[in-house]
């Protein structure tokens, strides 16, 4: 973990999910009207029941725009197989590095209505990482870093977008590419750091 605060938030939330999920539910439901919410730091849902709980919370707050990243592809596919009706205000990104990446499950997951597309980590010049150009588009070297990411992504997929690193800072008016239906099928990527 690069950032201890993020680790401890994840630890706290993991414990709350096991011991007192009502606290998580209450916090989610108390979000300000119309907010964009990034759900789950790591995107890994423990099981289908946890995934369904969060999807039901999204349905309870249709005014929110909720998005996330997941490697829990099997849980999504299992929930979908039950005939589950997904919330219209939620999108997830298929995070690279899933253990299901090179299986038939990848196509099933990518075909779900709540999956925006791939979120890929690509190898870039270490100089970009050393300068921390991946953290924000205002950082020195960010344009060069994003150009490098985009070039690598386009080797994989023609429709691609390089993440500048700071959620809500990539599109005008604080919009999030990873949570936008307009970016459906577009590979969004970052440099491995």
Feature roles, as predicted:
Residues 1-193:
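Class I S-adenosyl-L-methionine
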């Amino acid at each position: 973990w690069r950032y201890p605060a993020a680790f401890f938030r994840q630890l706290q939330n993991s414990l709350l999910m096991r011991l007192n999920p009502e606290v998580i539910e209450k916090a989610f439901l108390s979000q300000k009207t119309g907010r964009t919410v990034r759900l789950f730091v790591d995107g890994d849902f423990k099981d289908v029941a946890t995934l369904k709980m969060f999807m039901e919370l999204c349905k309870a707050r249709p005014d929110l725009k909720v998005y996330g990243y997941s490697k829990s592809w099997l849980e999504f596919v299992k929930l979908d197989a039950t005939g589950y009706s997904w919330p219209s205000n939620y999108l997830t990104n298929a995070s690279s590095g899933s253990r299901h990446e090179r299986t038939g499950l990848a196509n099933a997951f990518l075909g779900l209505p709540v999956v925006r597309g791939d979120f890929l980590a690509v190898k870039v010049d270490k100089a970009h990482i050393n300068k921390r150009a991946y953290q924000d588009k205002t950082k020195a070297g960010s344009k060069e870093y994003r150009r490098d990411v985009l070039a690598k992504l386009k080797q994989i997929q023609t429709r691609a977008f390089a993440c500048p690193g700071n959620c809500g800072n990539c599109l005008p008016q604080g919009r999030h590419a990873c949570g936008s239906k307009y970016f459906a099928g577009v590979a969004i990527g970052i440099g491995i750091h």
